[in-house]
Curated annotation (Swiss-Prot):
One of its GO terms (biological process) is proteolysis. It comes from Trimeresurus stejnegeri (Chinese green tree viper). Snake venom serine protease that degrades preferentially beta-chain of fibrinogen (FGB). It comes from the Eukaryota. Its activity is inhibited by PMSF and p-nitrophenyl-p-guanidinobenzoate (NPGB). This is Beta-fibrinogenase stejnefibrase-2. Disulfide bonds join C31-C163, C50-C66, C98-C256, C142-C210, C174-C189, C200-C225.
Length: 258
């Protein structure tokens, strides 16, 4: 059974007290310290469990299934051991999940918008990534980013986030591996058909960046990660642009597209 990316990490937390970080990009390389300025680490007392994307100084976008009590967000992080001087930590002030989301369907509208308790400042390692101006095209070059396990089964945690290059695939290429996916889920399929590069458990909520734009949110995938014919599934950000812009503008009663 395919698993929501964060659930695999929660199981690991139960099995091993020492390994508390989230899982992440399989088949990647160490990210450059300056290439993930919009990446947000979402964490609690057990460690990182999800990621998010800073879209302006006061708002973060992540997956709805990352919602949890008592979490914080870290901005400008790279190494877990060596702090950047410009790292900043914020709490959520308000959280918005689509009011028309089906609560018993984890794949439906897997997106959450978070207002910070205070704005963050742009710095050498912190900068927002704006919402996409147009939908992505099949075949686009995409980048995935995250902290955690760099192996799909035996957990191996790196100190810094890893990155990998993948491609946006046609939905028809994903359908055989995910017969449960429905068009109304508003998702993107991205990865390598032959496998080997993928996001993984705990990478949930992090960005899929295609041609320099924030197009997807890590949501769903096969387990183990990186299987052939089971690319990653990402919430399609563009379809929720109007909802997010309405919330940010103050219309907190706005609903998501059906």
């Amino acid at each position: 059974m395919e698993l929501i990316r964060v659930l695999a990490n929660l199981l690991i937390l139960q099995l091993s007290y020492a390994q508390k970080s989230s899982e992440l990009v399989v088949g990647g390389d160490e990210c450059n310290i300056n290439e993930h300025r919009s990446l947000v680490a979402i964490f609690n007392s057990t460690g990182f469990f999800c990621s998010g994307t800073l879209i302006n100084q006061e708002w973060v976008v992540t997956a709805a299934h990352c919602d949890s009590k008592n979490f914080k967000m870290k901005f400008g992080a790279h190494s877990k051991k060596l702090l950047n001087e410009d790292e900043q930590i914020r709490n959520p002030k308000e959280k918005f999940i689509c009011p028309n989301k089906k609560n018993n369907d984890v794949l439906d509208k897997d997106i959450m918008l978070i207002k910070l308790d205070s704005s963050v400042s742009n710095s050498e390692h912190i900068a927002p990534l704006s919402l996409p101006s147009s939908p992505p095209s099949v075949g686009s070059d995409c980048r995935i980013i995250g902290w955690g396990s760099i192996t799909p089964i035996e957990v191996t945690y790196p100190d810094v986030p890893y990155c990998a290059n993948i491609n946006l695939l046609d939905d028809a290429e994903c359908k055989p591996g995910y017969p449960e996916l429905l068009p109304e889920y508003r998702t993107l399929c991205a990865g390598i058909v032959e496998g080997g590069k993928d996001t993984c458990g705990g990478d949930s909520g992090g960005p899929l960046i295609c041609n320099g734009q924030f197009h997807g949110i890590v949501s769903y995938g096969g387990h183990p990660c990186g299987q052939s014919l089971k690319p990653g599934i990402y919430t399609k950000v563009f379809d929720y642009n109007d909802w997010m812009k309405s919330i940010i503008a103050g219309n907190t009663a706005a609903t998501c597209p059906p």
